[in-house]
């Protein structure tokens, strides 16, 4: 592990050579207390504590006089104390970012280029979103946008990135654990301002299994999205995704979101997500599962699946203060044909942040989860956050 740390530091120093560069860092703290009650299982109330501290060093190195080509990098050291029968201490060292990027500009178009390690996400943000090593190209014009990405996840650090679906993290592992190896392929076709400032996007995604777990399989997805203004302060986003694993059955993920900005410091969001389950349309759809565990059902350890998830949130932002209140209702789909549903539970969260100075931020988050199937079960957690930039 000492060798890994030396390699990361050496990379950081090498990248500092060349044109004038900028560098900085961040120290953060997250202290979380969790209170959980499971009366339905005749278990005593349980309290646990999680402590997470991180040190991040970043560097931006221009590679051209105009600054349109640059090399960005970031290394991190993270210390976790996870609750268990006995507390689990975990140390993580990671190269979180190593990205060469730039733009080729033409008269009426441009081409964006990115190579290296960086976070990649699909259009929905709920199917594939994790750190990956790869190459990204995008052609931009006022009429059409075309982009493509090819990457490899097997060299990134699982301990500090979004888990691959079906591939478990291990608390006992220290410093570095290779993520499950997949080759993500993403291609997007965009028509900006198709009509009345409405935007249309079509995206295909393939996740190719390169590991020895045959149950992972290859997954393929196609997404269609339409977004734009309804009027000056009201916007919408419609998305639907059809996917398949090894071409055995079809799964669907769809969402509708409305964003309203009544005041300059307030926005209100209403939406609903749908993820297919085995009983939908008499078994026409199979349970939905993405590639990475981005968004889980609040009442289920598995990926968001077999449910409707109505969501409402309101966001306040005024100068250094930012606050978000969100409520979700998790509805289990029992028989979509007969419109029979079961409410599994409710989830509420309040997230607040305050920038005391330009380099000092504090925050406080609260989350409450109520299991409506067993109304005596609930979970509450609160997190105190602090971050100092230098």
Language model segments and positions:
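Sec-dependent N-terminal signal peptides
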Residues: 4-15
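Beta-barrel outer-membrane channel/assembly domains of diderm bacteria
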Residues: 17-114, 135-142, 214, 218, ...
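Secondary-structure boundary elements
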Residues: 139-145, 191-197, 228-235, 244, ...
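Surface-exposed beta-loop-beta
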Residues: 199-257
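Extracellular/periplasmic loop regions
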Residues: 237-326, 338
